[in-house]
Amino acid sequence: MEARCDFCGTEKALIYCKSDSAKLCLNCDVNVHSANPLSQRHTRSLLCEKCSLQPTAVHCMNENVSLCQGCQWTASNCTGLGHRLQSLNPYSDCPSPSDFGKIWSSTLEPSVTSLVSPFSDTLLQELDDWNGSSTSVVTQTQNLKDYSSFFPMESNLPKVIEEECSGLDLCEGINLDDAPLNFNASNDIIGCSSLDNTKCYEYEDSFKEENNIGLPSLLLPTLSGNVVPNMSLSMSNLTGESNATDYQDCGISPGFLIGDSPWESNVEVSFNPKLRDEAKKRYKQKKSKRMFGKQIRYASRKARADTRKRVKGRFVKSGETFEYDPSLVM
């Protein structure tokens, strides 16, 4: 009895899909596996002509029959008879009727490949168009990188400041090998006079007003008291090298410059003598209410232990003579 297609139930099943464990005709194979790119990856093969349950592994050229691995050894024993066998490899994707005929030209009859409906090529073309549209989305996303300079999220302010301040010769005449380092004076660490960086700050303010870019307060902290204006001067600039990370560190965070320390308010609370006395009183009250060591759990054992004789603190066994002379112990 011929196996029928599991999808339509009317046509003869010729294809076996291992992923779906389904027997399909040629038309249903195209319709099912052209739905999305995931179904195109399913590996399919011809259906065994003997058992109609497993995919074919070989094609016997002498008997012109396609067999699975089990039917090859049990039903026909083509290997033992010395028949010419052709190995059949599974296929994927959705080949057109012309391509399908080329794949199984030596296996299927020409009348079988003609059973495929003519609209199968149209479905494959629509699927290719769908795949092409997905690549266009990626192309549009990559084109956004060309317009990144128009977004206000990123600014070229550090580079402009570097170009403006590069001609000031801030580090001219500085020899770090011989210069004494003084970390106590924040204004004069390298043992020379304070560097003039007012031009950089003036240009930074003018650049901010012209371009109307709202810089966060972290880049320009409020200067109060004896706080020194921070400079983006790194050791790499002294040697002639440049690095993008040199301009990310703008100095001390404003959280350490403005306001009181968060831990100063808790100092008085932890050393308050009144709270300490109240805690000691609560501890003594709980200690006086403890029952550990005062409760007799086994009254009968205690009564017997009080009457038993002891030698050096240990009980004397029953039946033994009790001879104890304290003078001998001394």
Swiss-Prot record:
Residue ranges occupied by any CCT domain in the UniProt entry: 276-318
InterPro entries registered for this protein in UniProt: CCT_domain (IPR010402), CONSTANS-like_Bbox1 (IPR049808), Znf_B-box (IPR000315)
Mapped zinc finger ranges (B box-type): 5-47, 48-88
Residues where Zn(2+) binds: 5, 8, 28, 33
Keyword NAD part of the UniProt annotation: no
Superkingdom field: Eukaryota
Intracellular or extracellular location(s): Nucleus
Thylakoid among keywords: no
GO CC annotation terms, alphabetical: nucleus
Gene Ontology molecular function terms on file: DNA-binding transcription factor activity; zinc ion binding
Pfam families: CCT (PF06203), zf-B_box (PF00643)
Keywords tagged on the record: Metal-binding, Nucleus, Repeat, Zinc, Zinc-finger
Stated family: Belongs to the CONSTANS family.
Annotated protein name in UniProt: Putative zinc finger protein CONSTANS-LIKE 11
Native source species: Arabidopsis thaliana (Mouse-ear cress)
Source taxonomy: Eukaryota, Viridiplantae, Streptophyta, Embryophyta, Tracheophyta
